[in-house]
């Protein structure tokens, strides 16, 4: 996977099929990190493991005389968090939605709206930025759906647009643009999300990918949507991948327990 992603990066950013060690600049690793996490949508922990392998290869090349210098020895990449993904709860999502902005804060408001759209559709950053009118499909009942292939895996996603997503899409609509949403550079987007979190008073640190987890957990699974359906909407190749999102949350536990109590009362049973 590391070799394939490196080749993809070199083709996309250097317009070449390969690079020699002497052609590698010191910022090569950082650029690759931005490409892998931003444009491809890989987890930070996955990117970290790839960079570790690249540095090992460069060290071996220097030791064997294939490279004149020891490349990237002082370059450090964040390990990321490989634990279970975190999602915003209802309170945090409402705090984010309630934010108000002055006229000069249009970029910050746009970043908030794009993030909320991701929360209601489950689309990853790289897919969000590529969505266009051709990805909108109307079903027999007149409902609007997003239909696209994930850039990361190529797996087909079908997501019915909730009223909140439709409202945000209409707000961000611009006839002069082919894409459904305005383009925000990945680094700028992450910076805006940090500012939004602090402004809203949300304690949980979140990134672009938190929106995807929020869709899986708060918007769908906690509302009773079957995990098989959620898996299809997220573009997961197997349900097992989606099960990482399906851990029982306190809210879900309380709701299921309340349903159990109501069920036993209806049947005049005791627990």
Can you say where each PLM-predicted feature lies in the sequence?
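Conserved tyrosine-mediated DNA breakage-rejoining catalytic core shared by Y-recombinases
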Residues: 74-77, 82, 90, 121, ...
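C-terminal catalytic core of Y-nucleophile DNA break-rejoin enzymes
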Residues: 82, 151-195, 207
